């Protein structure tokens, strides 16, 4: 199985151009002296976060990126042109790691954010630099320096306002397809969702981004099943929608399994605000519905919302509950930004 949220890429900056060995040749000047120009610098390697990309799939097909070398120096003290840069365009939320996949190089969280990964090699000196009192006509010049090279890992963590979590087949993809324009792959077997799907939810003239995170199983934080890679996707969401399927025999145990995985993974996931819903509720009769909602309320220590993506029951209530948390987080963020700007103005004055 291949995933689109991680890719290993080779990058190389351009070599510097060589300096020129050249002598001034003009009429009536017999010994013109050296006039070899310097070589141009090699191209750099940049990475930039751009709009319109949601996955790293492009880096499955092209994994080697090399900037152009600098142009060699020329006579008449002309410096060679700098080599063309290479810019890796990635989705917002991409993190760049060194080859060990642990050392973070940069984290791109905004559209237009750029980071210089590798600098091109310096150009070599032309022979004009080697003229001295004892050597008026030097026939040597420096070669350009080689460009840097590196293997890097690109890792994408989705930046979504809310994340859908739950065991496989809890009805997450069906819910996402119901409330957004996203078209996730849906089938009745575990791990249908092999990479996260994003959708935009509109409710009461407001909107937020919802991510369908692939199904967790017991031991996911240690890489079991699809692995802990996907727990990383929910790190940046402001609120979690925890779906428990009404088809589960023991809904309380199912709820606790996912909570254990969130706690074991760490990174504050278990402290995030959570909305709990019993999905696929249309499969239950009235008595089963009451029993399972009560058991879930006891396990979660909060009321669980009934939900059916098939009939539409409870969908609006769940979305409004999520929107309230998302809106509160946005207002808190805006207030913090305003306070920061005010403090900055006072510091500058």
UniProtKB/Swiss-Prot annotation:
Enzyme class: hydrolase
Entry keyword Magnesium: yes
Transmembrane regions: none
Known role: An essential GTPase which binds GTP, GDP and possibly (p)ppGpp with moderate affinity, with high nucleotide exchange rates and a fairly low GTP hydrolysis rate. Plays a role in control of the cell cycle, stress response, ribosome biogenesis and in those bacteria that undergo differentiation, in morphogenesis control.
Residues binding Mg(2+): 173, 193
Keywords, sorted A to Z: Cytoplasm, GTP-binding, Hydrolase, Magnesium, Metal-binding, Nucleotide-binding
Family: Belongs to the TRAFAC class OBG-HflX-like GTPase superfamily. OBG GTPase family.
Assembly and binders: Monomer.
One of the GO biological process terms: ribosome biogenesis
Cofactor: Mg(2+)
The protein's name: GTPase Obg
Domain OBG-type G: 160-327
């Amino acid at each position: 199985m291949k995933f689109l949220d991680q890719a290993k890429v080779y990058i190389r900056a351009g070599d510097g151009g060589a300096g020129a060995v050249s002598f001034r040749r003009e009429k009536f000047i017999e010994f013109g002296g050296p006039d070899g120009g310097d070589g141009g610098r090699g191209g750099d390697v940049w990475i930039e976060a751009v709009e319109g990309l949601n996955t790293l799939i492009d880096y499955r097909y092209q994994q080697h990126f090399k900037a152009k070398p600098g142009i060699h120096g020329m006579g008449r003290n002309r410096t060679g042109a700098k080599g063309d840069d290479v810019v890796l365009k990635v989705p917002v939320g991409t993190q760049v790691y060194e080859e060990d996949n642990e050392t973070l190089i940069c984290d791109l969280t905004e559209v237009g954010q750029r980071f210089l990964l590798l600098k091109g090699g310096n150009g070599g000196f032309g022979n004009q630099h080697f003229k001295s009192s004892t050597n008026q006509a030097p026939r040597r010049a420096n070669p350009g320096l080689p460009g840097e090279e590196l293997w890097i890992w690109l890792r994408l963590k989705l930046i979504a306002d809310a994340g859908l979590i739950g065991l496989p087949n809890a009805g997450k993809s069906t819910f996402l397809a119901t409330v957004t324009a996203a078209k996730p792959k849906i089938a009745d077997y575990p791990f249908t969702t092999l990479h996260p799907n994003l959708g935009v939810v509109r409710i009461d003239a407001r909107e937020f981004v919802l991510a369908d995170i692939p199904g967790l199983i017991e031991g996911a934080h240690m890489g079991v099943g699809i692995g802990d890679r996907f727990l990383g996707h929910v790190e940046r969401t402001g609120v979690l929608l925890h779906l428990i399927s009404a088809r589960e025999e023991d809904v309380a145990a199912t709820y606790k399994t996912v909570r254990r995985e969130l706690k074991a993974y760490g990174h504050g996931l278990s402290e995030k605000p959570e909305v709990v819903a019993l999905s696929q509720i249309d499969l239950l009769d009235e008595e089963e519905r009451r029993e399972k909602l009560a058991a879930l309320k006891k396990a979660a220590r909060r009321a669980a919302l009934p939900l059916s993506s098939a009939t539409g029951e409870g969908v609006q209530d769940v979305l409004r509950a999520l929107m309230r948390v998302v809106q509160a987080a946005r207002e808190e963020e805006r207030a913090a930004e305003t306070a920061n700007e005010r403090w900055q103005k006072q510091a500058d004055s």
